[in-house]
Amino acid sequence: TAETHLDPTLLISADEWKKIAVSKIDKPYILIFTANPAVSLVDFALKLSKEKNLPVYCINDAPHPVSHGINYIVAPTVEEFVGCFKNAEYVVTNSFHGTAFSVIFNKNLFVEFKNKSGRNIRSEGLLKSLGIDREIVDGNCNETEINWDIINAQLKTLGSKSKKYLSEIVNME
């Protein structure tokens, strides 16, 4: 069987990521970040916005707004991108890195695994390995409890294993 290891994004601690994070938003919000544009995620985020009474921000590389009721963060710098996740109250995503940064910063996250281009197996695998059940299915997701103390301990263990593996590969003759 193939051995799996953490994505390098997850090998850097939240404290290290926080050092570069820059945020221009100073109030609680819901963040949308998509690898593939998805109306279903926008709809889910807008529904969550009504429930939680929070504004929605969407990281987007397009210069024009796409949906009414959403604030767009267009082409953020790396520091702003990281800051968007660090300061979000909730994250709605179908992206592996959206999932990873949500986990790094211990965010209330909701992830859509299935989309038009297939299944996001990297996000699915990461969340299942950590025992997080926050999949959006047919526009719905239960806000199950996430015990971040347990998950952070698991991440630390998995990170040590991954770093050891990388060190062994780099030091091979």
What residue ranges belong to the model's regions?
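Active-site anion-handling motifs in enzyme catalytic cores
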Residues: 1-173
